[in-house]
């Protein structure tokens, strides 16, 4: 506990909030190159093969990013756009790849929430 005199001299210091997407360095998105594309299993009680990619960003930081949607065309050396947003059942995955930009194709046959998956409107 500081004395009144110490508080007069220094004052209280505000706590700084921890940044959840440090690798983006304050940007909404960052470009990167896939260094490895693979599947991993989620935490209990869920069971699946989640598609993830190891991405080297333009900030020269390597992160693990989730590939949302059904099916993808990503492979090593693909250019991707990465945004923040964690996947709750995959530890250490705090970024998501944006579908439909750069080398990433949109989800085919998607009818709802198309803008999230880079899917164009189907001709009726």
UniProtKB/Swiss-Prot annotation:
Gene this chain is encoded by: rpsL
Keyword NADP tagged: no
Domain of life: Bacteria
Keywords: Methylation, Ribonucleoprotein, Ribosomal protein, RNA-binding, rRNA-binding, tRNA-binding
Any one of the GO CC terms: small ribosomal subunit
Protein name: Small ribosomal subunit protein uS12
PROSITE patterns per UniProt: RIBOSOMAL_S12 (PS00055)
GO molecular function: rRNA binding; structural constituent of ribosome; tRNA binding
Organism, scientific name: Rhodococcus erythropolis (strain PR4 / NBRC 100887)
Job description of the protein: With S4 and S5 plays an important role in translational accuracy.
Compositionally biased region (Basic residues): 108-118
Modified residues (3-methylthioaspartic acid): 89
Chain segments carrying region Disordered: 1-32, 104-124
InterPro entries to which the protein is assigned, alphabetical: NA-bd_OB-fold, Ribosomal_uS12, Ribosomal_uS12_bac
PANTHER family: 30S RIBOSOMAL PROTEIN S12 FAMILY MEMBER
Record note on quaternary structure: Part of the 30S ribosomal subunit. Contacts proteins S8 and S17. May interact with IF1 in the 30S initiation complex.
GO BP annotation list: translation
Lineage, top ranks: Bacteria, Bacillati, Actinomycetota, Actinomycetes, Mycobacteriales
Matching Pfam families: Ribosom_S12_S23
Keyword Ribonucleoprotein appears in the UniProt entry: yes
Sequence similarity: Belongs to the universal ribosomal protein uS12 family.
């Amino acid at each position: 506990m500081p004395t009144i005199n110490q508080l007069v001299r220094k004052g209280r210091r505000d706590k700084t909030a921890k940044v959840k997407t440090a690798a983006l360095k304050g940007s909404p998105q960052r470009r990167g190159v896939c260094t490895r594309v693979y599947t991993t299993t989620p935490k209990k009680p869920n069971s699946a093969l989640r598609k993830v990619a190891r991405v080297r960003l333009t900030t020269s930081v390597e992160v693990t990013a989730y590939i949302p949607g059904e099916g993808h065309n990503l492979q090593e050396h693909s250019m991707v756009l990465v945004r923040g947003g964690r996947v709750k059942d995959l530890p250490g995955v705090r970024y998501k790849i944006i579908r439909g930009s750069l080398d990433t194709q949109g989800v085919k046959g998607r009818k709802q929430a198309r803008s999230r998956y880079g899917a164009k409107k189907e001709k009726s």
